[in-house]
Amino acid sequence: MTIQVCEYALITSDTSQKSGLDLGIVSKQTFSWLETLHQQWEGSAQIVSRQGKRFLRLGSYVGYLESPTGEAIEILPKTRLGEDEDPIRQRRVLRRMLQAAAGITPREGETASLYRSKLPLHEWIYSEFLRHLVELVRRGLRSDYHLTEDDDSAFIRGQLDINRQIRQVPGKGARFHVRYAEFTPQRIENRILRTVLEIVLSSTKENQTWRTATTLKHQMADIEPVSDALSQLSRWSDGKYLLAYRAIKPWCQLILEKHNPDFQKGGHQG
């Protein structure tokens, strides 16, 4: 379930209140999690009490939060003072803010349909990642040479490891210790893409997003995911050979940071 509020809104677990963009109602478990979380926000949120009821007043934080129970809170920017807010317009502003912060330049031809989308922020990020990944797979993922060692090869390819070969046990004289460079798509960029794809596939609630991600998973079945993908982003190459990968990298970073424990605890604020 996703709760939609504006920045500076109140959050409570009191179900007798009337919910709206200025007041969000969450479960007691989520409210308790938010109370713990707000202590790390350095004064950008505060706990207030009204008629014996506890509320959390949000600060200037905008973006998307997801509690450990799976309850989501979409926090939209205020765009008008003293007037009724339009969630669609607010989400449009939030997406522009996100694009500017991440250095993302959307394609002009897709801007209109992108802004008409009613997807929550996180689902929109998933769909944009998949859109870029579909294009990459269509063009062809880049491969690279990787050194492979085979201690039980039936034939000689590449370089024979003489020292190990002369110590070969009797009866295995026809098996070879070899090293060779294999041209494979198992480069770090592709493995990060596969890891992010797994996150999207397990997290999305949108049918179309799930179908697209499933198709891509089958197409990338030979590529192994990588552990601790967020820290591996520093190994991502920005050379000319990977020019087509530059547009998808910010989307990978956004998704990986969302699923990073430090981000879930408020380490990143937007």
Regions found by a protein language model. Give the residues of each.
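Long, well-ordered mid-to-C-terminal structural blocks that present hydrophobic/aromatic surfaces
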Residues: 266-270
